[in-house]
């Protein structure tokens, strides 16, 4: 990022300075979209409510606060309990902060003035949250635009702004959500700089993990190392999601690492490791998966499966450009996986027939990737008019859109040997006819391989943000402690 002038978020040392002008530009983009919408009347005002601090169940133990994502996108405010309003006609923005009691200074530190927040976030105006009713009344809005809509990844409804006195205003809660979501789909240059930074630090952390892993370690030791590196070197207090540190058969558990399986297995000689981890900086995510042999050397079978996934990953990235339909990229990955599994002897028969039978969904039951930004599964995958395709494999896609410049996505093909899916396939004559059971048996307990990259769609191709060893030779050299430079994949830009 160019030298930052004006107010910025910065955690010192070598961390990234992020100008708060990033959020002013986001508010400007939102107003421009809304003004073009014929349903938006003159005098409309956007009202967003930030996140609130929460406690651990019935205790007084605070859960570490992280800002609500839409509010962060628009204002970049790190404090809880705030509101923000934006005059659509003028673009003028007002931040509302809590009026804190004097006792706050004893327990939590200095109570800052409204002028402090105005300067910190480069706002047009700052008022207290208990004044929002009177301030909005004085502005005489024709309508308040509040945020209500469904997140297509979680199925949850985002929280709509509410405050004492809102009932006396005319409120529209249908216009704002699709417009602000579409703004979030396309990243500005300043946003891309932050995502390059999150990828830089997280990539370095993955390389440190690959150098440190040893047979006999606990999976959580590597989780700890990753998070320590991201925080100590990158200022990343939060991870983008719960770390997945799967070894052996755990590497076939797609969302391993949860409370019931907390990265607690002892890594064994001969295991494949699948580590899916990403640090978060100033609410901007990264999402990177590396797969490698625990002992630093690929077996023939591990190499065959790994290089099958690497081939599909690079084929997809090489094909990405504006206008490409994302479901076609999933079909491309499936075909390559089936070709390679046939080459290893696990499958036999016509690859075209395998594709028709949707056999690829047996070895890759998840989608191919997702939008990435302020949320790891970022919004905008299925706007109105984009329908989910009800076919095995394709129904798991987190988006079915055509690619456009400025979109940031993950590319994460994988091949997994999941017992219950294999058993179902072998019990289905339409699938069983393709399997060589004797060869397949050799891969039972193998686990899985996933390669996950973060990329931005450019005017003519894509830019790879992630920088980790990917070829078999690069991985083995890294795990042996070699600091020899490697060349990241570069498709058309």
From Swiss-Prot:
Chain sites annotated for binding Mn(2+) 1: 276, 287, 452
Q: Which SMART domains match?
A: AMP_N (SM01011)
- Keywords tagged on the record: Acetylation, Collagen degradation, Dipeptidase, Hydrolase, Manganese, Metal-binding, Metalloprotease, Phosphoprotein, Protease
What is a GO molecular function of this protein? manganese ion binding
Q: Do you know which InterPro entries this protein is assigned to?
A: Aminopep_P_N, Creatin/AminoP/Spt16_N, Creatinase/aminopeptidase-like, Pept_M24, Peptidase_M24B_aminopep-P_CS, X-Pro_dipept-like
Q: A Pfam family for this UniProt protein?
A: AMP_N
- The source's superkingdom equals Eukaryota
The record lists a dipeptide as bound by 255, 287, 377, 398
Q: Which family does it belong to?
A: Belongs to the peptidase M24B family. Eukaryotic-type prolidase subfamily.
What is the protein's given name? Xaa-Pro dipeptidase
Organism for this UniProt entry = Pongo abelii
Top-down, what is the taxonomic lineage of the species of origin?
Eukaryota, Metazoa, Chordata, Craniata, Vertebrata
């Amino acid at each position: 990022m160019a030298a930052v002038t004006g107010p910025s978020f910065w955690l010192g040392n070598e961390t990234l300075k992020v100008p708060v002008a990033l959020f002013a530009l986001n508010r400007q983009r939102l107003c421009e979209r809304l003004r073009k919408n014929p349903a938006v009347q003159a005098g409309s005002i956007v009202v967003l409510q930030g996140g609130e601090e929460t406690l651990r169940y019935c205790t007084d133990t605070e859960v570490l606060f992280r800002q609500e994502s839409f509010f962060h996108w628009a204002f970049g405010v790190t404090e809880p309990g705030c509101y923000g309003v934006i005059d659509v006609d003028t673009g003028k923005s007002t931040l509302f902060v809590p009026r804190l009691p004097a006792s706050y200074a004893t327990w939590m530190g200095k109570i800052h003035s409204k002028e402090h927040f105005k300067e910190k976030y480069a706002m047009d105006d700052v008022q207290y949250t208990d004044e929002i009713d009177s301030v909005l009344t004085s502005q005489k809005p024709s309508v308040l635009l509040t945020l209500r809509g469904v997140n297509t990844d979680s199925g949850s409804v985002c929280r709509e702004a509410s405050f004492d006195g809102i009932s006396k205003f005319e409120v529209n809660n249908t216009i704002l959500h699709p417009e602000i979501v579409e703004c979030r789909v396309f990243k500005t240059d300043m946003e891309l700089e932050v995502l390059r930074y999150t990828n830089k630090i997280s990539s370095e952390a993955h390389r440190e993990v690959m150098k440190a892993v040893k047979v006999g370690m606990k999976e959580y030791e590597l989780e700890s190392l990753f998070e320590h590196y991201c925080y100590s070197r990158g200022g990343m207090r939060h991870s983008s999601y719960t770390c997945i540190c799967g070894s052996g058969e755990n590497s076939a558990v797609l969302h391993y690492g949860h409370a019931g399986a907390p990265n607690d297995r002892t890594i064994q000689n001969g295991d494949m490791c699948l580590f899916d981890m990403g640090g978060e900086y100033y609410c901007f995510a990264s999402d990177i998966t590396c797969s490698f042999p625990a002992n630093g050397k690929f077996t023939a079978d591990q190499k065959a499966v790994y290089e099958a996934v690497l081939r599909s990953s690079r084929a997809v990235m090489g094909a990405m450009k504006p206008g490409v339909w994302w479901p076609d990229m999933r079909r491309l990955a499936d075909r390559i996986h089936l070709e390679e599994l046939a080459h290893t002897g696990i499958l036999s028969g016509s690859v075209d027939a395998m594709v028709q039978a949707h056999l690829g969904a047996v070895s890759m039951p998840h989608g191919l990737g997702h939008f990435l930004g302020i949320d790891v599964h970022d919004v905008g995958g299925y706007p109105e008019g984009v329908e989910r395709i009800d076919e095995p494999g394709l129904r798991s896609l987190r988006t079915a859109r055509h690619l456009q410049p400025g979109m940031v996505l993950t590319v994460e093909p994988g091949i997994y040997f999941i017992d219950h899916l294999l058993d179902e396939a072998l019990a289905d004559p339409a699938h069983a006819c393709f399997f060589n059971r004797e060869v397949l048996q050799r891969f039972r307990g193998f686990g899985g391989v996933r390669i996950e990259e973060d990329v931005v769609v450019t005017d003519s191709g894509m830019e790879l943000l992630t920088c980790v060893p990917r070829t078999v030779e690069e991985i083995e050299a890294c795990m042996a402690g070699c600091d020899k430079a490697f060349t990241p994949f570069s498709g058309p830009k």
